[in-house]
């Protein structure tokens, strides 16, 4: 039986270090948020959504968006919103500021998914550096656990996953780069 997957790009955040909405920063002439969205969608060949506040820019008008009851409550709230509403077996997450994580890396995450738990991107040179927002989650085996942790007051993803099966998938520092300032994209 083929497992179903969907993709979600986190569009929230204040971009305070960036000085402007980083989703709109051009990478090779294309808004960074769309670079990430297109990389993820190309990799999984399935429904892909932005998660977070309304994106008020014409380039994003055709891209579907998910808004949940925890909107504005940080990344863990967004993860719980997706897990709560997902209709697929697996969900793949990406933050909007990781344009160097290419379709082949997203495919690797999705293909590494297991019957339980989470496949999380980790830095090959610093394995303790996990990138929870670049990850693939088994919806059925993680949904209740994560929502319970959130409802108990937890807001840190690395603490909320305690007790879940975690598989590290290693990538290079460049592939995992978060663009937090305009100079990071040069």
Map each language-model feature to its residues.
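Nucleotide and nucleotide-moiety/phosphate-recognizing core
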Residues: 2-154, 159-175, 182-183
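Acidic two-metal-ion nuclease catalytic site recognized across multiple nuclease folds
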Residues: 186
């Amino acid at each position: 039986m083929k497992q179903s997957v969907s993709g979600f790009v986190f569009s929230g955040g204040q971009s305070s270090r960036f000085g402007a909405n980083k989703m709109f920063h051009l990478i090779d002439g294309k808004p960074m948020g769309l670079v990430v969205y297109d990389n993820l969608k190309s990799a999984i060949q399935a429904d892909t959504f932005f998660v977070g506040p309304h994106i008020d820019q014409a380039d994003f008008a055709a891209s579907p968006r998910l808004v949940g009851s925890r909107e504005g409550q940080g990344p863990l709230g967004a993860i719980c919103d997706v897990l709560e509403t997902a209709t697929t077996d697996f969900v793949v997450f990406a933050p909007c500021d990781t344009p160097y994580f290419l379709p082949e890396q997203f495919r690797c995450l999705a293909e590494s998914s297991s019957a339980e738990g989470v496949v999380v991107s980790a830095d090959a040179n610093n394995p303790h550096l996990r990138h929870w927002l670049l990850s693939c989650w088994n919806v059925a085996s993680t949904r209740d656990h994560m929502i319970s942790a959130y409802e108990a007051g937890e807001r840190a993803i690395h603490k909320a996953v305690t007790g879940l099966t975690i598989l590290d998938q290693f990538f290079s520092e460049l592939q995992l780069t978060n663009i937090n300032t305009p100079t990071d994209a040069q």
